């Protein structure tokens, strides 16, 4: 059985504390230049986890990832340029 997962983006003042975020979920990515951590945890625990993480002094901002709520199936539409055949009259 797979649990639904959702990402949390945590902006930090310093990357020194990025290892401490492992206890909240799986650390997927750490950006050294922009000082943020992408963390994955269970979708039903996301609100509690965000409140807990934002209470720490080394955390600047916490944002949820909206990827699970996006529609990823796209409709294939033809280009307008390819739709018309301009060489018919020649």
Curated annotation (Swiss-Prot):
One GO location term (cellular component): cytoplasm
Cell location: Cytoplasm
Domain of life, per lineage: Bacteria
Keywords from the named record: Cytoplasm
Keyword Cytoplasm set for record: yes
HAMAP family: UPF0298 (MF_01126)
Protein name: UPF0298 protein RBAM_014860
Organism per entry: Bacillus velezensis (strain DSM 23117 / BGSC 10A6 / LMG 26770 / FZB42)
């Amino acid at each position: 059985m797979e649990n639904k997962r959702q990402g949390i983006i945590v902006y930090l003042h310093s990357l020194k504390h990025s290892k401490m975020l492992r206890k909240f979920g799986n650390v997927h990515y750490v950006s050294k230049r922009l000082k943020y951590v992408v963390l994955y945890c269970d979708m039903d625990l996301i609100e509690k986890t965000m409140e807990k993480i934002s209470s720490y002094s080394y955390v600047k901002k916490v944002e949820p990832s909206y990827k699970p709520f996006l529609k990823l199936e796209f409709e294939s539409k033809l280009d307008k340029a390819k739709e018309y055949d301009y060489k018919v009259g020649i």
